[in-house]
A protein has these predicted regions:
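Zn-dependent metallo-beta-lactamase
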Residues: 1-22, 27-31, 36-37, 213, ...
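Catalytic core of the metallo-beta-lactamase
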Residues: 7-15, 105-157, 173-182
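Divalent metal-coordination and catalytic microenvironments
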Residues: 14, 24, 56, 63, ...
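Active-site environment of divalent metal-dependent phosphoester hydrolases
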Residues: 29-30, 58-62, 84-86, 102-105, ...
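Metal-dependent catalytic neighborhoods of phosphoester/phosphodiester hydrolases
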Residues: 63-73, 206-215
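Cap/insert and terminal regions of metallo-dependent hydrolase folds
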Residues: 78-85, 144-240
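Metallo-beta-lactamase
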Residues: 79-132, 221-246
Length: 246
């Protein structure tokens, strides 16, 4: 049976009956970017990967300096168009660049790029394999274009949704990530069997959090929002390293 294991933040390991896909790799930390929760794997302790998908070039979603320690440089990587050069610079050779609604077959797994909106160009993904369909929401805003995902993929088994509602204080509190409540509303549109919140433990550190960033989404608020707007969806809150069959 397919399983998922949270690594940290938006990095998730999806096991489609032995074919493992890693999302948005982030393994190291630096000033202004702290995991805020334990790290379940390092690049060298990961299992053999069938593919890596990466939504955008922000450090906490595309940590190639650290991920370069992963030994299989031929692992297929599916990334937003414009992100491939950096992966090739650190030695990865199997890079495919995509835009929304383009598809890539990686062995028995189908990867479809889907729309997103963030502070930089971004995509989300639908991953299909072993009879399951997974939506990975990276750290997008809740945009109307995501309703098309529900129309094209009417039987989503699992949705991985960001919930911290990140805002940039110096940019007049400009919001760049969906809130827990907006993620609950998106569950109402996508109607997944199971939803798992991601992208909520990150911290920039006490001073930067106070001066630069604002976020307040929690798993509890997400659970409450889903109960109101998508009561048929089961919410599972997972600690890093905790597996879930779906």
């Amino acid at each position: 049976m397919p399983t998922l294991t949270r690594v940290v933040h938006a990095a998730v390991l999806l096991d489609f009956d032995g074919h493992q896909v890693l999302t948005d790799p982030w393994f190291s930390q630096k000033p202004g970017y702290y995991h805020g929760e334990p790290l379940a794997f390092t690049p060298t302790s990961l299992p053999r990967l069938a593919a890596v998908v990466a939504s955008h070039r922000h450090y906490d979603h595309y940590d190639l300096a650290a991920f370069a320690a992963y030994p299989d440089k031929a692992v297929p990587m599916v990334v937003k168009r414009g992100m491939g050069a950096r992966a090739r610079e650190v030695g990865f050779t199997g890079v495919r660049e995509v835009e929304p609604w383009e598809q890539v077959e990686v062995g028995p797994i189908r990867v479809t790029a889907t729309p997103a909106k963030h502070g930089v160009p971004e995509i989300t993904f639908v991953l299909q394999g072993a009879g399951r369909t997974v939506f990975f929401g990276a750290d997008t805003l809740r945009i109307a274009q995501l309703d098309e995902v529900a129309r094209r993929f009417p039987a989503i088994d699992l949705a991985l949704l960001p919930i911290n509602g990140l805002k940039i204080r110096p940019a007049f509190n400009r919001q760049v990530v969906m809130t827990a409540e907006e993620a609950g509303e998106l569950c109402g549109a996508l109607r997944p069997r199971v939803a798992v919140p991601i992208h909520y433990a990150f911290t920039a550190g006490p001073l930067r959090d106070r001066l630069l960033l604002k976020y307040d989404g929690t798993p509890e608020r997400f659970q409450q929002a889903v109960a109101r707007q998508a009561p048929d969806t089961q919410v599972r809150v997972l600690a890093p390293g905790e597996p879930l069959s779906f």
